[in-house]
Amino acid sequence: MGQRKAHFGTMLRQRRLAKGYSLRKFAELVDVSPTYLSLVETGKAEYPPSAERVRVMAELLGEDPDQWTALAGRMPEDVKGIILNEPEAMPALLRAARGMSADQLRELTKQIERKNQEGKEP
């Protein structure tokens, strides 16, 4: 987890500076203290920001919220809810998909989306 925290913090700092945000201004926009934000950026925070705060950070920086949430070691709240609503089926699906390539996962996602659309058609 230490390397993940450091990598997330490094990426966050690089993107924040590239977008021209000061540490104080960005902390204010994300609703955290500048001290905590500094600890996150240096990989020294005891815990990563919440999934919701990471989503806000990503959106402010023009980054993909899901990718950034994963980079921070968090899980999007909606995904957590989906898993909790289907406590047997969802873990089984994820285990079955383990080891698939990114291309295979994208294709599987498309198949599931098509299946969902079929279920909505009259």
Regions found by a protein language model. Name each.
Residues 62-78:
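Short C-terminal boundary/hinge segments that cap the last helix of small helical domains
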Residues 20-40, 68-70:
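Short alpha-helical DNA-recognition segment
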Residues 1-18, 105-106:
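A short, Lys/Arg-rich alpha-helix, primarily the initiator
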Residues 51-67:
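DNA major-groove recognition helix of helix-turn-helix/homeodomain DNA-binding modules
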Residues 16, 27, 58:
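The alpha-helix within a helix-turn-helix
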Residues 73-122:
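Interfacial/linker helices and their anchor residues that mediate assembly or domain coupling
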Residues 41, 49, 72:
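DNA major-groove recognition helix of helix-turn-helix
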Residues 12, 23, 34, 51-54:
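Helix-turn-helix DNA-binding elements, focusing on the entry/boundary residues of the two helices
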